[in-house]
Swiss-Prot record:
Tissue specificity field: Widely expressed.
Lineage: Eukaryota, Metazoa, Chordata, Craniata, Vertebrata
Domain of life assignment: Eukaryota
N-acetylmethionine modified-residue sites: 1
Location relative to the cell: Nucleus; Cell projection, Filopodium; Cytoplasm, Cytosol
Organism: Homo sapiens (Human)
Family the entry assigns: Belongs to the ubiquitin-conjugating enzyme family.
Record protein name field: Ubiquitin-conjugating enzyme E2 Q1
EC identifiers of the protein: 2.3.2.23
Length: 422
């Protein structure tokens, strides 16, 4: 969304911009304009990445290089607030989706730290503009970036009535003095090496800066084909971010990536009990094939017959996730084949307390949900309806059935059958 330009500054794009001294990004440095950002800035960026990593619960560095920084302030998860709700008197930024973080961007000129960073926020909320306006009070120092971010995080916590995060105090730790003074005044030999260093750091993605051991353990046990899928997802996310077409939330995306990694490592997945495919490469839309059910069940026999008739011996489920996952359950429905029994409702919705807000827990893993659904279908004596009209299963009908299901059970509670009934 476009904003009126702050006086004395140019507006580079959406959101509000403040915090610099009127210099356009990239201006004021280079020949005749100062030496450009030195090693001190690099160490500031690395310190920020080590403190506010992509898994941080309050503030995250999304990406960083020598001339630009992108970060996110998370509103949910503190002070007993539910997902998607910002506790306290101030509401989330106008025009934002509940649960979305406050996205903040910073342009760093070549004359930093002589010229302070220039900040902007993806919102037209005047309260957020006021937070950035107060940065003009901080004008001097070799670590202006750290000082600015400490003020921003502290003021945002106050604005949303959130407790001050203890990690903010870590921004006060000094950088090695000899590396911020002697190296900033480089010799001619060091100046000749700077372009190579700068080129590397201009493409520095904070999320990818991981210890070799950490990355090895993260990918350990995942097949090459599935690693390629994960890498494609991350590449698409970076491209969407650059195009300004980010979907979902950081919170949900991080959790879904973890769930997918865990599934790819799982013995049940590797053993062929089920398969997972992303619909149109979307992390928020999964097709799950139940490939194996209890071999002693009538459902298993039906699937064997289905294979002979139609060439498919699996039950296809669809999982759709919202931005506030994992605090809300996924919406799960049967896509095919048409089933009777098994707690499957009209349209393909599934009657399970586990899949409602009342019965859901953010601690549940997606694999455990998949296996529970498989067991529930068998216990509910699900059978394939051969010759049934396949069009009776649709997303719209499933959502309608699910809504009615929730309303009924909110009034009457859930019935737990005796153990002898399965």
């Amino acid at each position: 969304m476009q904003q009126p330009q702050p006086q004395g500054q140019q507006q580079p794009g959406p959101g509000q911009q403040l915090g610099g001294q009127g210099a356009a990004p990239g201006a004021g440095g280079g020949p005749g304009g100062g030496p450009g950002p030195g090693p001190c800035l690099r160490r500031e960026l690395k310190l920020l990445e080590s403190i506010f990593h992509r898994g941080h619960e309050r503030f995250r560095i999304a990406s960083a290089c020598l001339d630009e920084l992108s970060c996110e302030f998370l509103l949910a998860g503190a002070g007993g607030a539910g997902a998607g709700a910002a506790p306290g008197p101030h509401l989330p930024p106008r025009g934002s989706v509940p649960g979305d973080p406050v996205r903040i961007h910073c342009n760093i000129t070549e004359s930093y730290p002589a010229v302070p960073p220039i900040w902007s926020v993806e919102s037209d909320d005047p309260n957020l503009a006021a937070v950035l306006e107060r940065l003009v009070d901080i004008k001097k120092g070799n670590t202006l970036l750290l000082q600015h971010l400490k003020r921003i995080i502290s003021d945002l916590c106050k604005l949303y009535n959130l407790p001050q995060h203890p990690d903010v105090e870590m921004l006060d730790q000094p950088l090695p003095a000899e590396q911020c003074t002697q190296e900033d005044v480089s010799s001619e030999d060091e100046d000749e090496e700077m372009p190579e260093d700068t080129e590397d750091l201009d493409h520095y993605e904070m999320k990818e800066e991981e210890p070799a051991e950490g990355k090895k353990s993260e990918d350990d046990g995942i097949g090459k084909e599935n690693l390629a899928i994960l890498e494609k997802i991350k590449k698409n996310q970076r491209q969407d971010y650059l195009n300004g077409a980010v979907s979902g939330s950081v919170q949900a995306t991080d959790r879904l990536m973890k769930e997918l990694r865990d599934i790819y490592r799982s013995q049940s997945f590797k053993g062929g009990n089920y398969a997972v495919e992303l619909v149109n490469d979307s992390l928020y839309d999964w097709n799950v094939k139940l490939l194996k059910v209890d071999q002693d069940s009538a459902l298993h026999n039906d699937l064997q017959i289905l294979k002979e008739k139609e060439g498919a011996d699996f039950i296809l489920l669809n999982f759709s996730f919202k931005d506030n996952f994992p605090f809300d359950p996924p919406f799960v429905r049967v896509v095919s084949p048409v089933l009777s029994g098994g707690y499957v409702l009209g349209g393909g919705a599934i009657c399970m307390e586990l899949l409602t807000k009342q019965g859901w827990s953010s601690a549940y893993s997606i694999e455990s949900v998949i296996m529970q659904i498989s067991a529930t279908l068998v216990k509910g004596k699900a059978r394939v309806q051969f010759g049934a009209n396949k069009s009776q299963y649709s997303l719209t009908r499933a959502q309608q059935s699910y809504k009615s299901l929730v309303q009924i059970h909110e009034k009457n509670g859930w019935y737990t059958p005796p153990k002898e009934d399965g």
